[in-house]
Structures are given as structure tokens and as C-alpha cells.
């Protein structure tokens, strides 16, 4: 299994405190729910505004009126949330990101400068700095038999676990990643 620093740069997310005291990177995901409100409350008030209870939005961020945001959620500065985006709660989105049309995100951390622009599902996942999902990319988070996700022989004790995507990754259109997939830094997956 790759080391944390070989996959992502935790300085590129306001959720970096979640990565302390973990053995495996996926152990961050269950910590989001218990910690996101504390992270939100500690954000710089000059950079973030609470637009609704437990929904924090950074300066110069554009949120389309046809998007849906369920609390708790943190959205960084200079980010764009486009029409039809559905943020289902326990979501941390970085600065300079795009969450596009018909994109659903839940219980995930999206690092700075990442783009999820069209018709994507991102559940129980981590997208590293400057990553991009092509149109229709799905990060599947549940096996058909609903058994625990196992990564390289290690039982994660999680039924729902999407993908861990490293820094500078580009995943081509219509790719579907199996639950528990880990993609290292500087990787391109060609479109289907």
C-alpha cells in the first residue's frame, strides 16, 4: 500500500487535520462526519461565510441556484458549483474547484484545483490536488454483494468506500472505478 505522502499533499485541503493519526488513507473518510463542523467553525471568517447552518463557502465562489447542498459542507474559495450539482453532506471541497452539471458528491474530500465537471458520481472518496474526472466517470463505492471492501488483502471494515485519487490525476470519460481503487500521482486513465 502506498504511503500517504506518495498519493496526496495534505497541505492542499482545509481538511488536513483529518489525516492525523491514521494508518491507512481510507481511515479519513469515517472521520469526516465527526469533524467537519469543528473544521468549519475554525475557518478564517475573512475567507469563509456560513451561508446556512453548517454550510461554509469561500470567497468568490459561485453556486448555481439549481444546485443542492446538504449540510454539513465546506466549499473553498474561487470554486464553481454548477447547475444540478448535488452535494449530499459531509463534503469538503477545496479552492479553485469545479463541481459540474449532474455531479453527485457525498462523504468525500476534494482537494484544491480539482475538477468534477459533468455527470459524475463521487461517493466516499478522496480526490487529490489538481485531479480531473472526465464526463461520466463514476467512483463506485459499494460492491454488489455489499461486503467489506478489501484493498491488497487488508479488510477496510467499510462497506462503502469509493476511490483514493492522487495528485495530478486525469481519469478519462466514462471510466468506472471499482470500490476501493487507489490511483497514484501523475496518472492518466484513457477514456473508454
Q: Language-model segments: what does each one mean?
A:
Residues 1-54, 181, 185-186, 192:
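Terminal amphipathic alpha-helical/low-complexity segments used for targeting or macromolecular assembly
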Residues 45, 49-146, 150-191:
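Structural signal for interior beta-strand "rungs" in well-ordered beta-sheet cores
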Amino acid at each position: 500500500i502506498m504511503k500517504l505522502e506518495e498519493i496526496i499533499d495534505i497541505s492542499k485541503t482545509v481538511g488536513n487535520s483529518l489525516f492525523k493519526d491514521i494508518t491507512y488513507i481510507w481511515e479519513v473518510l469515517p472521520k469526516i462526519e465527526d469533524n467537519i463542523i469543528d473544521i468549519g467553525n475554525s475557518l478564517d471568517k475573512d475567507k469563509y461565510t456560513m451561508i446556512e447552518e453548517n454550510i461554509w463557502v469561500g470567497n468568490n465562489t459561485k453556486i448555481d441556484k439549481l444546485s443542492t447542498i446538504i449540510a454539513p459542507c465546506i466549499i473553498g474559495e474561487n470554486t464553481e458549483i454548477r447547475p444540478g450539482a448535488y452535494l449530499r453532506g459531509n463534503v469538503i471541497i477545496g479552492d479553485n474547484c469545479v463541481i459540474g452539471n449532474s455531479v453527485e458528491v457525498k462523504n468525500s474530500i476534494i482537494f484544491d484545483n480539482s475538477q468534477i465537471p459533468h455527470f459524475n458520481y463521487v461517493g466516499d472518496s478522496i480526490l487529490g490536488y489538481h485531479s480531473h474526472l472526465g464526463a461520466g466517470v463514476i467512483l463506485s463505492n459499494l460492491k454488489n454483494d455489499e461486503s467489506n471492501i478489501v484493498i491488497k488483502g487488508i479488510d477496510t471494515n467499510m462497506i462503502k468506500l469509493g476511490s483514493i485519487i492522487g495528485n495530478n490525476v486525469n481519469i478519462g470519460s466514462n471510466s468506472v472505478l471499482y470500490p476501493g481503487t487507489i490511483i497514484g500521482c501523475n496518472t492518466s486513465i484513457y477514456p473508454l
